Amino acid sequence: MRQQPLQWHPAFQAAMQIELAEYQDWLKYEREHNLTQNPLQIDLLIIKMEQGRQIEKSIGRLFRRYNIIEYKGPSDYLSINDFYKVCGYAFFYKADTVTEDEIPIEEITISLVSRAYPRKMLRHLREFWKCRVKKMEEGIYYVTGSKIPIQVIV
């Protein structure tokens, strides 16, 4: 008969509550907190199947092997929260593999597509993340200074 694996999380959570007991009046503990109500879904994932091939179209020049695209429809806009959500998708996509480092982080790009220039989001990236935003051509902006190459397409 196969043994059930020992559940260590409840013991760890109890130990944390004991350790922080003097602060219990203003701490809230949420065990196994769900990050989303809906399934995580990347709007579009473009995988380059042939290494070393370069896309000449301006929209795909930044592409590496795994390219995560976030699209905002005509009545929506790219927000600061969208930036963090898509970065989270990229990191989760990288980590959700069978073997460690199966998807190298340097093989991932992010493209954020919107009808309008995301002024507030890009200001946040410049000021908080110290990224640089460079207009590559009409409607295509590269964000540099991040671990993952990012382009904004408007």
Where are these regions (language model features)?
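Conserved single-residue anchors adjacent to enzymatic active/cofactor-binding motifs
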Residues: 1-154
